[in-house]
C-alpha cells in the first residue's frame, strides 16, 4: 500500500514516542528522524527500527533528493519558526508540536476537517487536546457562557519547557476553549502533581449552561465526543458521569456541568503516567493521517 512519507524533526522524548505511533500507521511511513545530537537515544532507536536517522539537522533533510510529504516538528518554538517557511516553500505540510502556533490550532475530534490542506497546523497544548473536546461536546448542544478547565499532570512528565511556559499554556488553552470549544469565555489552569508514584493526567471541565438546558442531550454528546477522542487516544476516559448543578445565587441564573477525565499514556516510549504527552503524540498522528489521506487521494 502506498504511504505518505514523513520526517520527525526532533529526537527527544516527544519525537521518539511519536515515531513508535507512526510506525504502526497504515498510511504514513516515518522515513526520517532528524536531530542534532549524534548520541541521542531517539536517533539510536530510530536506526534500530529501520528509520533513517541523522544528527545533521533540517539542512540535511531538505537537501535530500527525496523529501517528506509531512514533517512533524517536535523541537522548540524558536526552531520551528525558522524551519516552517522552508517546509512551506517546498510544499511539505507541517504538524507543529511546539508552542510556535504559526498555523491554525487543531483538535482532531473537533475541527480536523477544516484544516486538511493547511500548510501548517499546531496542536495547542496537552490540556487543550484533553479538554476542548468536552467543551465542544457541551457547546454543540447549548450555549456555554463560561468554561473552566483544570489540567493536573504528573510532575516528572513536565520538562523544563513546560515549566517555563506555564503562562503560555494558560493563555493558549483558554483561547482554544473559546475559539474551538465554543465557550464565550474560557479559563485554563495547570497543576504539576508531585505525587509519588506519579499519577495519570487528570482533567476537570466546568461549563456554565442555561438552567433549562437539555441535560440528557448534553450527557449523550459528552459520551459521543469522548468516544471520538478515545479512537485515537485509547487511554482517554471519563472518570465519572457528568455532574449537573442547579443555579445558585452566585451563578447568575446559570446551571453548571462538571466533566471529569483521565488520560493514561500508551507506554510506547514514555511512561503510562505521561498521558499529557501521549495525547499530543496521538493527536499529531491523527492529524498526520488526515493529511496523508488528502495527499494520497490527490496523487491517485
Swiss-Prot record:
Q: State one molecular function term (GO).
A: NAD binding
Keywords, ordered alphabetically: Aromatic hydrocarbons catabolism, NAD, Oxidoreductase
Q: What class of enzyme is it?
A: oxidoreductase
BP GO annotations:
catabolic process
**Amino acids binding NAD(+):** 11-14, 157-165, 276
- Tell me what reaction this enzyme catalyses: acetaldehyde + NAD(+) + CoA = acetyl-CoA + NADH + H(+)
**Which EC number(s) does UniProt give?**
1.2.1.10
Q: Which domain of life is it from?
A: Bacteria
Q: Which Pfam families match?
A: AcetDehyd-dimer (PF09290)
Q: What does the record give as the active site?
A: 126 (acyl-thioester intermediate)
Q: Which family does it belong to?
A: Belongs to the acetaldehyde dehydrogenase family.
Q: Which NCBIfam families match?
A: ac_ald_DH_ac, PRK08300.1
Write down what this protein is called. Answer: Acetaldehyde dehydrogenase 5
User: Which species is this record about?
Assistant: Rhodococcus opacus (strain B4)
Provide the taxonomic classification.
Bacteria, Bacillati, Actinomycetota, Actinomycetes, Mycobacteriales
Amino acid at each position: 500500500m502506498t504511504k505518505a512519507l514523513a520526517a520527525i524533526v526532533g529526537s527527544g522524548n516527544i519525537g521518539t514516542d511519536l515515531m513508535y505511533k507512526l510506525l504502526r500507521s497504515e498510511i504514513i511511513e516515518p522515513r526520517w528522524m532528524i536531530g542534532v545530537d549524534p548520541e541521542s537515544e531517539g536517533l539510536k532507536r530510530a536506526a534500530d527500527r529501520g528509520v533513517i536517522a541523522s544528527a545533521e539537522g533540517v539542512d540535511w533533510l531538505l537537501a535530500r533528493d527525496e523529501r517528506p510529504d509531512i514533517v512533524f516538528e517536535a523541537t522548540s518554538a524558536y526552531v520551528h519558526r525558522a524551519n516552517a517557511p522552508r517546509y512551506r516553500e517546498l510544499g511539505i505540510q507541517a504538524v507543529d508540536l511546539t508552542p510556535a502556533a504559526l498555523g491554525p490550532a487543531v483538535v482532531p475530534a473537533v475541527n480536523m476537517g477544516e484544516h486538511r490542506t493547511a500548510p501548517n497546523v499546531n496542536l495547542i497544548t496537552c490540556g487543550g487536546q484533553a479538554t476542548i473536546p468536552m467543551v465542544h461536546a457541551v457547546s454543540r448542544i447549548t450555549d456555554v457562557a463560561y468554561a473552566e478547565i483544570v489540567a493536573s499532570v504528573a510532575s516528572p512528565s513536565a520538562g523544563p519547557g513546560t515549566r517555563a511556559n506555564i503562562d503560555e499554556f494558560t493563555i493558549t488553552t483558554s483561547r482554544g476553549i473559546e475559539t474551538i470549544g465554543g465557550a464565550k469565555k474560557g479559563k485554563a489552569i495547570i497543576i504539576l502533581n508531585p505525587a509519588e508514584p506519579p499519577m495519570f493526567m487528570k482533567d476537570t471541565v466546568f461549563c456554565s449552561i442555561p438552567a433549562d438546558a437539555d441535560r440528557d442531550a448534553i450527557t449523550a454528546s459528552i459520551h459521543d465526543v469522548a468516544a471520538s477522542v478515545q479512537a485515537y487516544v485509547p487511554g482517554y476516559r471519563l472518570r465519572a458521569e457528568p455532574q449537573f448543578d442547579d443555579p445558585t445565587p452566585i451563578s447568575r441564573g446559570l446551571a453548571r456541568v462538571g466533566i471529569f477525565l483521565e488520560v493514561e499514556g500508551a507506554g510506547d516510549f514514555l511512561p503510562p503516567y505521561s498521558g499529557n504527552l501521549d495525547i499530543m503524540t496521538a493527536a499529531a498522528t491523527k492529524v498526520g493521517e488526515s493529511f496523508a489521506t488528502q495527499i494520497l487521494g490527490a496523487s491517485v
